[in-house]
Amino acid sequence: MEATLSLEPAGRSCWDEPLSITVRGLVPEQPVTLRAALRDEKGALFRARALYRADAHGELDLARAPALGGSFTGLEPMGLIWAMEPERPFWRLVKRDVQTPFVVELEVLDGHEPDGGRLLARAVHERHFMAPGVRRVPVREGRVRATLFLPPEPGPFPGIIDLFGVGGGLLEYRASLLAGKGFAVMALAYYNYDDLPKTMETMRIEYFEEAVNYLRGHPEVKGPGIGLLGISKGGELGLAMASFLKGITAAVVINGSVAAVGNTICYKDETIPPVTILRNQVKMTKDGLKDVVDALQSPLVEQKSFIPVERSDTTFLFLVGQDDHNWKSEFYANEISKRLQAHGKEKPQIICYPEAGHYIEPPYFPLCSAGMHLLVGANITFGGEPKPHSVAQLDAWQQLQTFFHKQLGGKSHGVSPKI
């Protein structure tokens, strides 16, 4: 009897969907190795492997069988995806073109040999970033450079602006996945893209105001206000937008700073200067990486750098990796909470994830624990442990969707009357 490897859903799924992986037709109690691999658009290879043993019937179901070794151990039905590691050190998995899938190759090999035994079965599975029917609309309105993703069904939908961090460009994969959940999501570029500025010495909030007004005025976006989703530098900019601009009902900040970092933030005649970088506080890890977690002066010391969140009427959710080594995300979230409450504002929700690092991504993205930091100009540690980080990503994804549906009046379950 030949071994077969089956996946459910078969053939294709969305990146944030769980996969059921089963092997049948093995010898009872047979030791096997499962391997998974994918290549990103730049040709970089990501791989994971895990050792398993078939049950008494010669079957192996990853939802019931623990991994005995390899890239991860224990009961981890999605471990072969989230535990992938890049062949090139410090390479972060990002999706550059959401209109094509990541193609995952899975193999079942006989035995537990490190170099791999005889190939018993293989399968290829496509992990997509746009659910069927999701619409992708490039935006060039005034100065705004963005891509808007709309759900398949007729609108209007709750609107969200999605902001990524240092590096610039236009990353669309989080917005495209969220559009499959009933939101109109606009991935917004703000530097190093198209005809936008190449650097970010000054962040002018007027640009972001134009984006907010565009999205609020879109016929497929329901009002009155919109949501913001920002990670890292995008979280910092989201806080500035919520502080200075009207029309932002809800904001999710993932590991953001409450201080301006590496650039000035300007709005009209107001300027927030960046906090001082304390170069003598940069440490080296035992792996020879820079650890910059203590390298920023506290905004409590340099109050002028503190983004004036107390002006905001936005409802906030802070998602915090407690092992973030990019900067002190938990400290920042707590200081924002204190500042808001001191000014009679609503206490924000803060969810802390132990042993989670800086880049809390949509589910199943492998942990990027170290990599090039463009402000530092060197490889730094971003923190995090693979297993707890993967748990954090799964929970954070659910939390932010629940939050936005609640705050922005998400899925309306009634049937709209025919006009």
UniProtKB/Swiss-Prot annotation:
Its EC number is 3.1.2.-, 3.1.2.2. One of its GO terms (molecular function) is fatty acyl-CoA hydrolase activity. SUPFAM superfamilies: alpha/beta-Hydrolases. InterPro entries: AB_hydrolase_fold, Acyl-CoA_thioEstase_long-chain, BAAT_C, Thio_Ohase/aa_AcTrfase, Thio_Ohase/BAAT_N. GO terms for biological process: acyl-CoA metabolic process; fatty acid metabolic process; long-chain fatty acid metabolic process; negative regulation of cardiac muscle cell apoptotic process; very long-chain fatty acid metabolic process. Pathway: Lipid metabolism; fatty acid metabolism. Induction: In the liver, by peroxisome proliferator (Clofibrate) treatment, via the peroxisome proliferator-activated receptors (PPARs) or fasting for 24 hours. It is found in: Cytoplasm, Cytosol. Its main location: cytoplasm. PANTHER family: ACYL-COENZYME A THIOESTERASE 1-RELATED, ACYL-COENZYME A THIOESTERASE-RELATED. This is Acyl-coenzyme A thioesterase 1. It comes from Rattus norvegicus (Rat). The lineage of its organism: Eukaryota, Metazoa, Chordata, Craniata, Vertebrata.
